[in-house]
Each structure stands twice: as C-alpha cells, then as structure tokens.
Amino acid sequence: LRFDAKGRVWYSVAASNHIGVYDPRDGSHRWIRLPAPTWGQAFSSRALPFFLWLSRNFDLSGASGGEGVSAPVPYGVDVAPDGGIWFSQLNAHRIGRIDPETLEVEIVDTPFTAPRRLRFDGHGKLWIPGFSSGLLARFDPQTKKFETWEIPIEPRGSETPYALNVDRERDLVWICGTNSDTLLRFDPRTESFTVYPLPTRVTYTRELDFDREGRVWTSNSNMPAWQIEGQMPRVLRLDPHALPVPE
C-alpha cells in the first residue's frame, strides 16, 4: 500500500494483474488492468474468476497442470516525486508507470529477472530488488537507464532480495537478505554494501521501515511460521549506529 499526495491508496492486485486505487474521500475504488507480455498471461488473468469457480465446484485433485502459464504478478508499488505511480511485474520481468490522472500505463522491461518491492529515493531514482537475479538495481525515469550491483552474499547470485526501502534522510538503501538471514545497507555515494547478520536462523524478511533515529525495523514472515529457529517469529530492530561495522 502506498499513499499519494491526495491521500489516495494505491495497491497491487497480484492474481488478476491489476493496480487498484482507493479514494477515502468518497469511498471510490478503481482498478487498472495492466498489460500482459503474452496472450497466455493475458487470458489466464482475465479467466481467473472461472478458474476459481472451477476449483470450488469440481474435484481437480490428481490433475496434472502440465507446464502451466505464469501470471505477470504485479507486486511492488510506489509513488514518484512527480506523482506518477510505479509498479513491478514479478513474473513479467518489467516495471511500469501509471499516470494518476489519465490512468495510462507505460511499460519498461528490466535487464534482470523478478523485480519485486521497489522504492523511490529523495532524488527521484527508483531502487528495485532483483528477487531471482540476486542484485540491486537503480532506474532513472528521466533517462530510462538501469544500473545494477550484485549483492555480496556467497555463493554469488544466491541471494533473493524480497524488498528494500530507502532511508531518504540519510540517503541509504536497505535490503532484505531473505535467503541469508541478513539485512544489507547500500551507500550510493560509495557504491558499497554493509552486511548485518540477523540473530536468528531461517528468517524470512519481506519489508523494512525506519524510525526517526534511523533504526531499521523488520519482522520474520515464514510460511509456516514454525520453520524459523525457535519456532517463534519476531519483530526485529537494528540500530546501525550502536553496532560495530562488520568487516
């Protein structure tokens, strides 16, 4: 969920390939159907109500799904400084912009796979985690150019960054080390990473936020929850100013 300057709430509807917008002033909802890269993905998104009805009314246990058709899966959403609404399509390997007034959609292919929960920094640049590509990307909406950095977790390419957030006051990018029980900080000025190991094993972090002191907050979100060490999910707070910087 992201709020724009008018107080409207923008959100992704992953299964049916929509971005939704809710205006609390009048209670109105609107849904923007996003383009799909293939005919099969477009059909599967539109036919979702039929598939759900089919699964509720017929016993499909034991049926083979074959190779199947992946859905585009709109995922991350954020509001740009100019008011534009940007989103990612996880399985379509692209990002896009929605004009908040005309609702016209512009699509941009990414040079990496599986863009997920993206965020803008204070300079109007869009930061994107490459979930299945193990990298961090920065996109300039003005030049339409991408820059990428490999996340320094061994073995290289094994990290699956689920989400990131930008501490705009300090101009730092924080990333969920979802596959390595870490949080990572990236400094765009030096193009360097700092890796902070978490105190619990088999964590799964899906979101980050900050408090006024610059401390980082996240939570464990395993499914099922008992997979985590100690079988008890936790809310975590990391204070980067109170810890020695890891070598």
Give the ranges of each region predicted by the language model.
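Beta-propeller fold detector
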Residues: 30-37, 41-44, 106-110, 147-152, ...
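Conserved beta-strand positions in repeat-built beta-propeller and related beta-rich domains
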Residues: 9-15, 70, 85-91, 126-132, ...
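Short loop/turn segments that connect beta-strands within beta-propeller blades
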Residues: 23-27, 99-103, 140-144, 187-191, ...
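A short loop-to-beta-strand structural motif that recurs across blades of beta-propeller domains
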Residues: 18-21, 94-96, 135-138, 182-184, ...
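Blade-level signature of beta-propeller repeat domains, shared across WD40, Kelch, NHL, RCC1
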Residues: 205-247
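Beta-rich catalytic cores
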Residues: 15, 73, 91, 114, ...
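Beta-rich, blade/repeat-based domains predominating
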Residues: 1-6, 38-82, 111-123, 154-170, ...
